[in-house]
């Protein structure tokens, strides 16, 4: 598969192998530059499903949508690109299907979580401690709250809680104290390089600095974009949008995301057999999901060498085994 110049798709072969099984509506809820969407469309074409299928690509980043429109130009008749958040997957699917006279049920949904390589490499987005830029970190540039707002307004206790909760940072209190001291003595934390210097000053061990920087920047990014709340909403509504035997594939990159995804999938796969000792022959409620992958799929060494971002990626896939369900509106 030809690589996208904007975003190198992670685990693309596994995604298409487990997701593209029949014609229908496919949703890439985290479109990015269109790398995974292109892989899905090519898989549909190879299987002879393309003319009876539609791909809906969702992203809140205008630059990503522009890049994806170029990547998917060959398939413009069978793709619809929508600016939005993947937590709105139900309403977006409903609107697109209503416009086209289609039943609003998806054969497959993909969520590739985290920040794209392009966003990390663009200094002006403020996602990376390796790039000198503003403390922004907004996925959607139309949203109001930036990382600078959080760093410069939260008190020490709130900052420490944030870094520990979303970054699992063991030195969260020390880092928060250094940030507040800097604000009191110097003024506002104005950019990524200033924040990185404060963090390095709090964590003097050079062998630990990179992981500490990564955890703090991750925590801020999650808070700015409300990523975990958005993920929970997207998982819940996404499952409701699946057709019978439709599948959802989710790629996560850190333990907080993966725990949420795993917990949700496992819980939705369980059947309710009522109180212990009753000995019911049929469950009160059957699980709505089947676990296609009992354990997460990971990249092999070849892919990791070609695309280091794949090293931390975990792919989980489930299938809707419930014949009923609510349609998207």
From Swiss-Prot:
Keywords: Cytoplasm, Methyltransferase, rRNA processing, S-adenosyl-L-methionine, Transferase. It catalyses: cytidine(1402) in 16S rRNA + S-adenosyl-L-methionine = N(4)-methylcytidine(1402) in 16S rRNA + S-adenosyl-L-homocysteine + H(+). Its main location: cytoplasm. GO terms for molecular function: rRNA (cytosine-N4-)-methyltransferase activity. The keyword Transcription regulation does not apply. HAMAP family: 16SrRNA_methyltr_H. This is Ribosomal RNA small subunit methyltransferase H. It comes from Chlorobium phaeobacteroides (strain DSM 266 / SMG 266 / 2430). The lineage of its organism: Bacteria, Pseudomonadati, Chlorobiota, Chlorobiia, Chlorobiales. The gene is rsmH.
């Amino acid at each position: 598969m030809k690589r996208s110049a904007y975003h190198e798709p992670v685990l693309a072969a596994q995604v298409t192998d487990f997701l593209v099984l029949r014609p229908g509506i496919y949703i890439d809820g985290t479109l990015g530059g269109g790398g995974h969407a292109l892989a899905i469309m090519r898989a549909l074409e190879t299987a002879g499903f393309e003319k009876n299928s539609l791909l809906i690509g969702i992203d809140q980043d205008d630059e990503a949508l522009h890049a994806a429109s170029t990547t998917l130009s060959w398939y413009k008749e069978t793709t619809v690109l929508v600016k939005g958040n993947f937590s709105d997957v139900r309403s977006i699917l409903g609107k697109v299907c209503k416009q086209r006279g289609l039943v609003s049920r998806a054969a497959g949904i993909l969520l590739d979580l985290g920040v794209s390589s392009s966003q990390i490499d663009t200094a002006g987005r403020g996602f990376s401690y390796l790039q000198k830029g503003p403390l922004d970190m907004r996925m959607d540039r139309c949203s109001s709250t930036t990382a600078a707002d959080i760093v410069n307004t939260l008190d020490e206790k709130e900052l420490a809680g944030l870094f520990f909760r979303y970054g699992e940072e063991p030195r969260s209190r020390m880092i928060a104290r250094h940030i507040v001291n800097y604000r009191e003595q110097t003024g506002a934390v104005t950019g990524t390089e200033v924040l990185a210097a404060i963090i390095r000053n709090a964590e003097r061990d050079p062998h630990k600095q990179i992981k500490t920087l990564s955890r703090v920047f991750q925590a801020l990014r999650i808070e700015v974009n409300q990523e975990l709340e958005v993920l929970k909403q997207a998982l819940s509504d996404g499952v409701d949008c699946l057709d019978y035997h439709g599948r959802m594939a989710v790629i996560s990159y850190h333990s907080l995301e993966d725990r949420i995804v795993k917990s949700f999938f496992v819980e939705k796969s369980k059947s309710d057999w009522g109180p212990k000792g009753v000995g019911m022959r049929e469950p009160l409620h059957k699980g709505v999901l089947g676990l296609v992958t009992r354990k997460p799929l990971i990249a092999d060494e070849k892919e990791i060498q070609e695309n280091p971002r794949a090293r931390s990626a975990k792919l989980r896939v489930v299938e809707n085994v419930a014949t009923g369900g609510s349609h998207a509106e």
